[in-house]
Amino acid sequence: MEILMTVSRIASICTMGANASALEKEIGPEQFPVNEHYFGLVNFGNTCYCNSVLQALYFCRPFREKVLAYKSQPRKKENLLTCLSDLFHSIATQKKKVGVIPPKKFITRLRKENELFDNYMQQDAHEFLNYLLNTIADILQEERKQEKQNGRIPNGNIDNENNNSAPDPTWVHEIFQGTLTNETRCLTCETISSKDEDFLDLSVDVEQNTSITHCLRGFSNTETLCSEYKYYCEECRSKQEAHKRMKVKKLPMILALHLKRFKYMDQLHRYTKLSYRVVFPLELRLFNTSGDATNPDRMYDLVAVVVHCGSGPNRGHYIAIVKSHDFWLLFDDDIVEKIDAQAIEEFYGLTSDISKNSESGYILFYQSRD
């Protein structure tokens, strides 16, 4: 058995090497970006959900730069961020341009910190992204709090930290955080009240044969509050009919859009995949911003897509397609391939309403030009 496993492993390594060599030849020495590395990640038993998100984040340059900068800070005790910075540093400092790296340390730490991921089952890539970004933000805020208490940050207002005031934003917030404003207009007195809500990613509903722009328009549709759902107006001091809508008040540097492709079907007693065809453009301008938006005309470029392959949330596979400099790459665990920009259309989804196996965009990463 051991001999068979060894032979299988050697064959796998040979395949990885051949793939890496082919990629390097296809890009060519003159076109290969300076100081760039394209490394696949070994799958440790259904960890494609993790590998695909890590590759997408690695090619979100502002995020990569912050993680690598964290590596150069004084050594801290091991946590998910130190493991991530070690992994990114390992990729960025390889002598070879292409190859494969095992993210074993990161996966081990992830499984130790969250029981949701402590198994060999397929997990949801969006849940992992959400957990990772929030965990990194928590780590950075806790470290900042400790530095203030130890007097390493001048004018650190420790009292503020202890009075339940909002902690200082971290570079995770600077990169990914946007703000939504929930506007409610009373139809009796016309008074508008608004409530702000921060987000690190936006989850949008999907419909058949539509586009991301259409999905975002649906996200901001006006809803009428009436009957038993009437709104309590402070001005009228009674429940009134009202119009409610969500708008974007502050756009993030990197906009992460999650397409809600998994829907619970009562008759099946399980989640099924909506393989609907949803077109996502290479360039995006958001239109559903509030009147006092800080940057209403921000233009975005698509830099990465996490793709779900399969028919349901707990089965199937995840891959990532990323833009690096002027070309596109497909990362499928340890395999890395160069693809044409036109090939991205293959990941829009299917025109059939039937739940089938499909390769469809699940999380989109758009980076602001300014």
From Swiss-Prot:
One of its GO terms (cellular component) is plasma membrane. GO terms for biological process: protein deubiquitination; proteolysis; regulation of protein stability. Residues 145-167 are annotated as: Disordered. Residues 39-369 form the USP domain. Residues 155-164 have a biased composition (Low complexity). Its EC number is 3.4.19.12. The active site is at 48 (nucleophile), 317 (proton acceptor). Deubiquitinating enzyme. Has almost no deubiquitinating activity by itself and requires the interaction with wdr48 to have a high activity. This is Ubiquitin carboxyl-terminal hydrolase 12-A. It comes from Xenopus laevis (African clawed frog).
